[in-house]
């Protein structure tokens, strides 16, 4: 009989990992303390690219490139399977007035990515509502955004087709089941759940969950707040990014503006100060938004990690314990590659990319 894997955490990383493991023929039990996909996976903007990809390490770049190329097919597959459209919306992205534009263009040439310098007039022609005063632009075609909550819902629905997968929501993990040095399951609010392997994919909460084992995982919550406007469907044809803030168009005319970076522990309370700052950024990017009220304002907790390099693989000294966590600002961006790589390693397949940079060994 195939191995049983207990996956802790049903955000996009946990959902997609469970799917990949089930596709690989393993028996999977997915455990989520609340509802699937309701934490950072719900709260993020959904750009299928790191905000500044040239500023990241080769380790993050390798995961991002594989995932970006995979997302359109994943979106179509989930729509076909479930009837729920994750809305992989390919619109392209303009970066405005970059301080490190030379480095960005060098990175694009090195990695053969379609990022190029364009006349600022082109940006203003493509985005008629763009604020005045921007001097320089670079553009990358093919950059998509995904409707995070719909991606999570479609992933959850897709899991129902697998006879070898169980999902337990409203089930909080409260401890680890041990057999000597081996981790053999989790103690939960609804009883014990055992498996041959246990995979932790609990995002910002991963570090706290590992503390009872004496492990110090440098993954900490980093709060991000966003606001949402409702405009005409054709109001913003492209994504735009300047001074670390971005505007993302959804197909139905919703415009997301983000995001803050705050070290506030596990507090997810939206603040007036952040809304004021985000509204100022919205007005600078798209002045027509200045006279509009946001229709929503929320916060989520990213799993902050050193250099944003996730932990993917087995934990030394704790046989049976695996990690897929610590993706920081790029959980959605890196999810397809991270989860496929994890499934490759766990099932003994040839890995899609070199797993060494992500191994927990030597990093805990």
From Swiss-Prot:
GO terms for molecular function: flavin adenine dinucleotide binding; glycine oxidase activity. Substrate binds at residue 302. This is Glycine oxidase. Keywords: FAD, Flavoprotein, Oxidoreductase, Thiamine biosynthesis. Its EC number is 1.4.3.19. It comes from the Bacteria. Monomer. The keyword Flavoprotein applies. Belongs to the DAO family. ThiO subfamily. One of its GO terms (cellular component) is cytoplasm. Pathway: Cofactor biosynthesis; thiamine diphosphate biosynthesis. Catalyzes the oxidation of glycine, leading to glyoxyl imine and hydrogen peroxide as primary products; glyoxyl imine is used for the biosynthesis of the thiazole ring of thiamine. Otherwise, glyoxyl imine is spontaneously hydrolyzed in water to produce glyoxylate and ammonia. Can also use sarcosine (N-methylglycine) as substrate. Pfam families: DAO. It catalyses: glycine + O2 + H2O = glyoxylate + H2O2 + NH4(+); sarcosine + O2 + H2O = methylamine + glyoxylate + H2O2. It comes from Pseudomonas aeruginosa (strain ATCC 15692 / DSM 22644 / CIP 104116 / JCM 14847 / LMG 12228 / 1C / PRS 101 / PAO1). FAD binds at residues 12-13, 32-33, 40-41, 45-47, 173, 327-333. One of its GO terms (biological process) is thiamine biosynthetic process.
């Amino acid at each position: 009989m195939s191995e049983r894997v207990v996956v802790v955490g049903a955000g996009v990383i946990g959902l997609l990992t469970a799917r990949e493991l089930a596709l690989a023929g393993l028996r999977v039990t997915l455990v989520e303390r609340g509802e699937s996909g309701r934490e950072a996976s719900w709260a993020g903007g959904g750009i299928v690219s790191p905000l500044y990809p040239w500023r990241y390490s080769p380790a993050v770049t390798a995961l991002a490139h594989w995932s970006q190329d995979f997302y359109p097919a994943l979106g179509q597959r989930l729509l076909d399977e479930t009837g729920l459209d994750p809305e992989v919306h390919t619109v392209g992205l303009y970066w405005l007035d970059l301080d490190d534009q030379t480095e960005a263009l060098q990175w694009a040439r090195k990695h053969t990515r379609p990022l190029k310098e364009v006349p600022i007039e082109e940006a203003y022609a493509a985005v008629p509502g763009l604020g005045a005063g921007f001097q320089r632009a670079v553009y990358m075609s093919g950059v998509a955004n995904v409707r995070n909550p719909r991606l999570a819902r479609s992933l959850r629905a897709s899991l129902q087709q697998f006879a070898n997968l169980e999902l337990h929501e409203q089930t909080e993990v409260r401890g680890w089941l041990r057999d000597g040095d081996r981790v053999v399951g989790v103690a939960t609010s609804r009883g014990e759940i055992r498996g041959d392997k246990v995979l932790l994919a609990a995002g910002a909460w991963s570090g706290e969950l590992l503390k009872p084992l004496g492990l110090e995982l440098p993954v900490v919550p980093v709060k991000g707040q966003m606001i949402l406007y409702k405009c005409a469907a054709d109001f913003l044809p492209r994504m735009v990014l300047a001074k670390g803030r971005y505007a993302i168009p959804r197909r139905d005319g919703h415009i997301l503006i983000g995001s803050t970076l705050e070290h506030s522990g596990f507090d997810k309370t939206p603040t007036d100060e952040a809304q004021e700052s985000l509204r100022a950024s919205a007005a600078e990017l798209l002045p027509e938004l200045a006279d509009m009220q946001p229709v929503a304002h929320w916060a989520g907790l990213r799993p902050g990690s050193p250099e944003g390099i996730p932990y993917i693989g087995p934990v030394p000294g704790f046989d049976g314990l695996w990690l897929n966590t610590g993706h920081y600002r790029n959980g959605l961006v890196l999810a397809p590659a991270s989860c496929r790589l994890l499934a490759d390693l766990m099932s003994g397949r040839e890995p899609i990319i070199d797993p060494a940079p992500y191994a927990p060994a030597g990093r805990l």
